[in-house]
């Protein structure tokens, strides 16, 4: 399994779309999936989409990686933004799928320069809006 993980390729589109999210703010979120031996972009969220739109886009029974650009207001009333990396690994997904996603996560995350907060979730309650907000502050 480790050998397969170290050979996991990251499609250039993943890095390009992440740069667009980070610098141009073209997207609110990006959902990635492992397709064979590479990570590919599955869905791009428009800038006006909400956190609820994002969570609704994650499959209930399959693992995914995701990046979410979270806008918030600090206690000092300052507008801020943090980029979250979310490793979605629902309990109901297949064991092999969970292993592949877990073993490839760090390598994939290293390709995305600018991640500020990482979150691992096996259940929607582990990535609720309140949890995201508390991790951002």
Swiss-Prot record:
Tissue specificity: Specifically expressed in pollen.
GO biological process: actin filament depolymerization
Ranges for domain ADF-H: 7-137
Subcellular location(s) per record: Cytoplasm, Cytoskeleton
Disruption phenotype: Decreased actin filament severing frequency. Increased amount of filamentous actin and inhibition of pollen tube growth.
Example GO molecular function: actin binding
Entry's Gene Ontology cellular component terms: actin filament; cytoplasm
InterPro entries membership: ADF-H (IPR002108), ADF-H/Gelsolin-like_dom_sf (IPR029006), ADF/Cofilin (IPR017904)
Keyword terms: Actin-binding, Cytoplasm, Cytoskeleton, Phosphoprotein
Disulfide feature: none
Modified residues (Phosphoserine): 6
Domain of life: Eukaryota
Entry function: Actin-depolymerizing protein. Severs actin filaments (F-actin) and binds to actin monomers. Binds monomeric actin (G-actin) with a marked preference for the ADP-loaded form and inhibits the rate of nucleotide exchange on G-actin. Required for pollen tube growth. Promotes turnover of longitudinal actin cables by severing actin filaments in pollen tubes.
Family: Belongs to the actin-binding proteins ADF family.
Stated name of the protein: Actin-depolymerizing factor 7
Species of provenance: Arabidopsis thaliana
Organism ancestry: Eukaryota, Viridiplantae, Streptophyta, Embryophyta, Tracheophyta
């Amino acid at each position: 399994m480790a050998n397969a993980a170290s050979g996991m390729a990251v499609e250039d589109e993943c890095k390009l779309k992440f740069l667009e999210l980070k610098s141009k703010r073209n997207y609110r979120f990006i959902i990635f999936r492992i397709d064979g031996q590479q990570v590919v972009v599955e869905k791009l969220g428009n800038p006006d989409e909400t956190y609820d739109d994002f969570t609704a886009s994650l499959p209930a029974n399959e693992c995914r990686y995701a990046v979410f650009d979270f806008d918030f207001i600090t206690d000092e009333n300052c507008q801020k933004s943090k980029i979250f990396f979310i490793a979605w690994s629902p309990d109901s997904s297949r064991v092999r799928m969970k292993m592949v996603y877990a073993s490839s996560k760090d390598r994939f995350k290293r390709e995305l320069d600018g991640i500020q907060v990482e979150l691992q979730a096996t259940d929607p309650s582990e990535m609720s809006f309140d949890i995201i907000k508390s991790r951002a502050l």
